[in-house]
Amino acid sequence: MTTIAAVSPLDGRLLGHFPVSKPALIQQQLTKSRRAALLWRELPVTERVKRLSPLKKQLLDNLDRLCETIRLSTGKVRTEALLGEIYPVLDLLAYYQKRAPRILRTRAVSTSPFAFPAATARIERRPYGVVAVISPWNYPFHLSVAPLLTALLAGNAVILKPSELCLPVGQLIVDLFATLDLPDGLVQWVIGDGQTGAELIDARPDLVFFTGGLQTGRAVMQRAARHPIPVMLELGGKDTMLVLADADLKRASAAALYGAFCNSGQVCVSVERLYVQQACFAEFLAMLLKGLSKLKVGHDPHGDVGVMTSARQIDIVQAHYEDAIAQGAKASGPLLRDGNVVQPVVLWDVHHGMKVMREETFGPLLPVMPFSDEAEAIKLANDSDLGLNASIWSQDIIKAERLAGQLDVGNWAINDVLKNVGHSGLPFGGVKQSGFGRYHGAEGLLNFSYPVSGLTNRSRLPKEPNWFPYSASGYENFKGFLDFIYGEDSMLQRGRRNQQALQAFREFSIFDWTQRWQNLKLLFSWTRDD
């Protein structure tokens, strides 16, 4: 395969041909990225922010063109392209414009006035170097630009490998960054399928950030382990929605439809398991089915549910539907498929032996299951190998937040769905087999750098008390010194019984408070971590 034909899932139209990146070219790109990274990392964080900030105007000035390119490449409706792809990037950039310099600032760390009387300690943040961002097809703009932008702010160069299903969006991204005042080669991309992704990892970037399915995530991790290269994995979910009997059922049913069928269910935090308390199950299901009948599905750019992006994913949805029906599930209707248009379906009379309740569906199926009490709800929700996101619905916020604390997930929301993933200040990521690593928030920015710790000793003495030579008396003095520092009775009592040890250490200026005060002016130039 030398080229990839980009075809729109909307109507099959050809969007362009893209040349597949060869291993030799990828290696050349990595070399170029390393040169750019050396220049970029030397810039202060404030200067990096300044050079990346014009991206905001580029996005705002080209909203219609961006949304249309995303719509043609993915099949999602225009509003979802705007709110699910462009808005989160704008908000993330605005968040880091204000906070990145402080988040990445050198931090002072307290030192013991006894063991380190003449020393200061600090933690610096350094960029990895070259980051490979391997992004998915469901949100090809947001899930490419968010890690790309974060990696750049942290001081790295980036090579993007977008999904082969959405190459026009990848081209759009590199074109946008080409308009910025960045070192040549700081943002590059490679073109191809999974094999190209493997070749990118074999070129040995310094960090790999992958978003996608569990199976591919394992392959990425195995490939990176050969070298070894650190990885961050944002994988799938089998996300739950718990509706308690005291919930606002009208709001909750509307949220369930949106949470399950937004982007045709192709969202890592889609509602894929809906548990409703038995006392309100029948009423809630009736409201759900009524709302389902009103959804506008198809090619309308201003409809509710667009088309699915991947034919292979449609086959998985079909298999999950057929398995559930074969095991006795009831459905709101048949799984109607017209090209890449798949009609959303609600399922009930389901159980955890069905694929639709255990495996990630990533499509417009919503299984609904009753529970008797809170304990059963938590047990059902946690009965999964995945742990990405969840929501709890109740008018008793204290109760809902208490239950949220029992969920094995990386993220949760009370009385809302999906929206928490778009909060730029909240670190997002999963637990269990939903991956590890975070993006968004301070944690997300820190994850694209590594800590370097430093200790500066300004003592003018010829030696430290712990240096050679050792002696028996020295051992006894150290014992007394440790008892004085860490003993749990009063300092006066500890001082009386350890007078000999304390006297022995005076020659080493253990209590040289003058030097300690001299170090304070250095501490005020950094931020403290405690």
Curated annotation (Swiss-Prot):
Q: Which GO terms describe its molecular function?
A: oxidoreductase activity, acting on the aldehyde or oxo group of donors, NAD or NADP as acceptor
Gene3D superfamilies in the cross-refs: Aldehyde Dehydrogenase, Chain A, domain 1 (3.40.605.10), Aldehyde Dehydrogenase, Chain A, domain 2 (3.40.309.10)
> What is this protein's record name?
4,4'-diapolycopene aldehyde oxidase
Q: What is the lineage of its organism?
A: Bacteria, Pseudomonadati, Pseudomonadota, Gammaproteobacteria, Methylococcales
> Which UniProt keywords are present, listed alphabetically?
Carotenoid biosynthesis, Oxidoreductase
Q: Source species, please?
A: Methylomonas sp
* Gene Ontology biological-process entries: aldehyde metabolic process; carotenoid biosynthetic process
Q: What is its EC number?
A: 1.2.99.10
Catalytic residues of the enzyme: 234, 268
Enumerate the InterPro entries for this protein: Ald_DH/histidinol_DH, Ald_DH_C, Ald_DH_CS_GLU, Ald_DH_N, Aldehyde_DH_dom, Aldehyde_DH_NAD(P)
